């Protein structure tokens, strides 16, 4: 995908955003810093939605956007949409399915689902023509075995008719005919090879990146429908795709903190054989990604310290640095500073 296009979609005309953070958020690079900026930018639900899909050319992408006057950029590659950039963003949004679907592609491996489904469609299509001599699409071994098992279990039960009916019903419900065309042009079957994003883009008069995003969002929409139908014959294709909201290690640290109130964070770190700084990072991760009602802020954040920080906090929390805050509050540590910011952002969310 073209990173410059992606940056336009997830930038703002009212908030300077770190271009590197936007990219790291979308590919799901799980650090407390990236999670915090996702919360700050309102992109937490999109975290990891484009995992493995973006190139590593931030400098070139920002330069391109700046030269075309779509963004303003500073020396740290923070970007702000110009009026021209906002207009272009609006046009991009109008050309795509609903972007709220990204929240689902963040929670599930939609790219993996699309590969499974494409192989399943190819196999069933060839089966319907009694053709055993073809080259199946290459996907991961475990996924290939899953599809093979699924096909063997269901092929005798009018599978071609069922699959055709399901896909036809899905395509008929799409808001635009062009979305249905993009989806089907990507599929392979009997005497039919799926087109590349570039080929589909030429036919549709759209960029390959817009085609890629459209496909991702359409596969996401289909996946959400299948997840709501546990009795569907295609339900096995959705297995093992869910992504955890919180990392396993952070969840373990947070669980110990909640279940054993007598243990200090230092003691928890000792029992878990991790560094104290790592334990703090785990608790910050939990505070960011879990619902506010699940976080015992009253135990984590000293009330008197919270009052001091509340008295001096600026209107824009994103522009408030630890260095500035620590000059105003004696013995302030970064953990409490960041925790305070997280709580404030969640309260105003």
Question: Model-derived features: where do they sit?
Answer:
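Short amphipathic alpha-helical interaction segments
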Residues: 51-67, 207-216, 277-282, 332-335
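Short Lys/Arg-enriched helix C-cap and helix-to-coil transition segments
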Residues: 222-239, 290-306, 349
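Accessory beta->alpha helical hairpin/"wing" motif in late/C-terminal subdomains of nucleic-acid enzymes
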Residues: 72-112
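Exposed, interaction-prone assembly regions rather than primary DNA-binding/catalytic cores
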Residues: 97-173
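A short, conserved structural fragment
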Residues: 63-76, 224-225, 288, 292-293, ...
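Short alpha-helical "recognition helix" segments of helix-turn-helix
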Residues: 22, 199-202, 268-270, 321-327
């Amino acid at each position: 995908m073209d990173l410059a296009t992606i940056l336009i979609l997830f930038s703002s005309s009212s908030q300077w955003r770190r271009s590197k953070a936007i990219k790291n958020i979308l590919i799901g690079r799980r650090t407390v810093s990236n999670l915090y900026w996702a919360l700050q930018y309102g992109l937490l639900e999109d975290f990891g939605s484009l995992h493995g899909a973006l190139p590593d050319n931030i400098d070139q992408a920002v330069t391109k956007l700046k030269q075309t006057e779509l963004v303003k950029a500073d020396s740290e590659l923070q970007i702000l949409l110009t009026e021209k950039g906002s207009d272009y963003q609006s046009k991009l949004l109008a050309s795509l399915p609903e972007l709220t679907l990204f929240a689902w592609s963040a929670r599930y491996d939609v790219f993996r689902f699309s590969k499974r489904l494409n192989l399943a469609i190819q196999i069933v299509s060839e089966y319907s023509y009694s053709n055993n001599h073809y080259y199946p699409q290459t996907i991961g071994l475990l996924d290939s075995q899953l599809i093979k098992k699924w096909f063997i279990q269901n092929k005798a039960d009018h599978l071609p008719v069922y699959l055709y009916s399901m896909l036809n019903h899905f395509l008929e419900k799409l808001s635009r005919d062009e979305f249905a065309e993009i989806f089907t042009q990507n599929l392979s079957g009997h005497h039919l090879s799926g087109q590349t994003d570039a080929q589909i883009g030429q036919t549709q008069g759209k960029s390959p990146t817009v085609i890629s995003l459209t496909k991702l969002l359409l596969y996401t929409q289909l996946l959400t429908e299948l997840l709501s139908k546990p009795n569907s014959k295609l339900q096995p294709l959705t297995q093992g795709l869910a992504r955890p909201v919180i990392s396993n290690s952070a969840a373990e640290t947070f669980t110990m903190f909640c279940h054993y109130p007598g243990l200090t964070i230092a003691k928890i770190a000792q029992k878990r054989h991790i560094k104290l700084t790592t334990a703090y990072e785990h608790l910050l991760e939990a505070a960011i990604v879990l619902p506010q009602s699940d976080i015992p802020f009253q135990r984590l954040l000293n009330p008197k310290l919270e009052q001091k920080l509340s008295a001096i906090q600026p209107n824009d929390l994103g522009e408030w640095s630890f260095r500035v805050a620590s000059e105003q509050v004696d013995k302030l540590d970064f953990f409490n500073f960041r925790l305070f910011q997280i709580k404030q952002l969640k309260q105003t969310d």
